[in-house]
């Protein structure tokens, strides 16, 4: 089965690579329109997936990731339209010039070819990834989680209908609908057809891909994100940022998981934090230094376990640790962070600059929420992933991250001396 999918994707990629920006945008507009026109079939499939997931004991955080609503589906369609409005990087000349030999040389952006994406219970990923791949002239093979099998099948069927109505092969966007995990291992060895692989899931999936894939892998998406509250932070303003970073949508990878509080502000900050977190129904996992003071407040508090500093909760849980100073905070982030998104809240711009320079994450913020690490927020349109590695792409992966380049030399029967 996968062999045939690979052949179809590779053949489709050749055709996609030749499309003009106008032709690609016409396809995307058709997909957006069809997602809305056929929303009932997608929402019905999603309702079945959610019901099965709830019956199987999936957590509320995971159910939130899985669930589609009419408003969310409308937002997904609008994201596709936003991709239409983005500049097409394919064909851009990055640099070039004329050599001493007279050869005119240029470096031009081109599609990667075929992208493989493995992801879990996030039905929006199906459309986000497909739209970005099509905009950049790439074919894509999707392997979603078993929890979203009906939703993904219904969504891909809509996309393929739109492709065919525009005269393009259905092989441009395909999904592996068989939940057999052995197919993941088989997919990881499809280097004959797939040019880049992007896993979007937990640490286990990333480890599997790194160890078994014969395809170049872009890893990321695991977000143990931190906010450091410096001693000069404005408490009321800091709490607004923390509430946003923790509660706006707890199941996302850019949600804060650990709060580091400077010891010199702890006495005034912790009572205010407890009150605010109680109102937001957040459970605090406190270290020894913060435990007694937080237990005196209204928030639910438990003693933090050492391993929880490495956990991506994806829920209304927040670690709280007292640190001696900025050095202590940076050391903690280096040990426990995942190089995703980290922030400092401070009025001391020297400390802010040190934090920016010394915290080696894909996104670093000063006096802002970690929730901004998102392709849409960055103006990139829908994102294919958030890369936490350093090669090829880093941070939210938009259109340019799905391209490579080729060197083009134009001469007049020019030969090398």
Curated annotation (Swiss-Prot):
Cited InterPro entries: Ald_DH/histidinol_DH, Ald_DH_C, Ald_DH_N, Aldehyde_DH_dom, G-glutamylP_reductase_CS, Glu-5-SA_DH, GPR_dom
Family, per entry: Belongs to the gamma-glutamyl phosphate reductase family.
Name of the protein this chain belongs to: Gamma-glutamyl phosphate reductase
Origin species: Escherichia coli O127:H6 (strain E2348/69 / EPEC)
GO MF terms held by the record: glutamate-5-semialdehyde dehydrogenase activity; NADP binding
SUPFAM superfamilies associated with the record: ALDH-like
GO-annotated cellular components: cytoplasm
Origin superkingdom: Bacteria
